[in-house]
């Protein structure tokens, strides 16, 4: 299952690379696609989702070396399978759309990426099966306790981050508390209602964990701090997305995986 999740992640990364290269060479309305504000926003958001997905995938792998790793992997692997495989479909579809007719025809190979990506959410457990597996890990093995502890650990590291990242860490902490509350409610609601909310619970867990991991990374790398801030504004507090200017002011360098000095990162983080 983890291997299939990484297949989805690999297709997402390859598709993003194709999209980024195309955007730096293809012109429309006399400008490169990457310089069109809407396209740059879309590329940065795909990049941020990719960074969050890589953080989650690497966490699943690293869990093998932790004392609580068995419970972490038990709950994070099915959750990662949902997110990473779906991301492969989303990013490959976006890339086909960005290429237009060239993306749809067979000459460029993008449709092959999309066809393969569509297989992965089904392979080794559909999204519904994986969501129910997350629920099972919570109910039977209390695996959420390991997740909450890992989130707390990441937030402790992020506490040493630059001040402009505080907005993101507070959003993650709020989601962490909400996740704990929703898990506690499982003991007082009936089985059918619990199953009905499995997808929502998995999504809440994913956003919380990915946000925490990005904040942890952002404590030591300014460009990662911008990624964490963009992720929190888009995925954890979407009302802030309307004012976010990270893609507008620093999107080109983020797409190119350029390094940022702390001063420039703080300027880009301002809304």
Residue ranges and their predicted role:
Residues 1-271:
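Flavin-dependent oxidoreductase catalytic core characteristic
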């Amino acid at each position: 299952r983890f291997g299939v999740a990484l297949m989805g992640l690999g297709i997402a990364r390859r598709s993003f690379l194709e999209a980024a290269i195309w955007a730096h060479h293809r012109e429309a309305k006399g400008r490169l696609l990457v310089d069109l504000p809407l396209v740059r926003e879309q590329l940065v958001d795909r990049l941020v989702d990719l960074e969050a997905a890589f953080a989650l995938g690497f966490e699943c792998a690293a869990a093998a070396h932790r004392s609580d790793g068995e419970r972490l992997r038990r709950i994070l692997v099915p959750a990662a399978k949902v997110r990473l495989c779906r991301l492969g479909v989303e990013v490959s579809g976006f890339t086909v759309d960005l290429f237009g007719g060239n993306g749809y025809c067979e000459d460029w190979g993008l449709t092959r990426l999309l066809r393969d990506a569509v297989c992965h959410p089904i392979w080794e457990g559909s999204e519904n099966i994986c969501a129910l597996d997350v629920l099972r890990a919570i109910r039977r093995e209390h695996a959420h306790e390991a997740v909450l502890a890992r989130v707390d650990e990441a937030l402790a590291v992020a506490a040493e981050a630059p001040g402009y990242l505080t907005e993101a860490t507070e959003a993650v902490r709020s989601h962490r508390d909400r996740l704990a509350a929703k898990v506690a409610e499982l003991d007082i609601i009936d089985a059918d209602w619990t199953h009905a909310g499995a997808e929502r619970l998995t999504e809440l867990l994913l956003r919380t964990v990915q946000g925490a991991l990005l904040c942890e990374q952002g404590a030591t790398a300014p460009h990662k701090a911008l990624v964490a801030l963009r992720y929190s504004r888009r995925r954890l507090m979407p009302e802030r997305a309307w004012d976010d200017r990270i893609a507008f002011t620093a999107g080109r360098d983020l797409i190119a995986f350029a390094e940022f000095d702390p001063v420039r990162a703080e300027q880009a983080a301002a809304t």
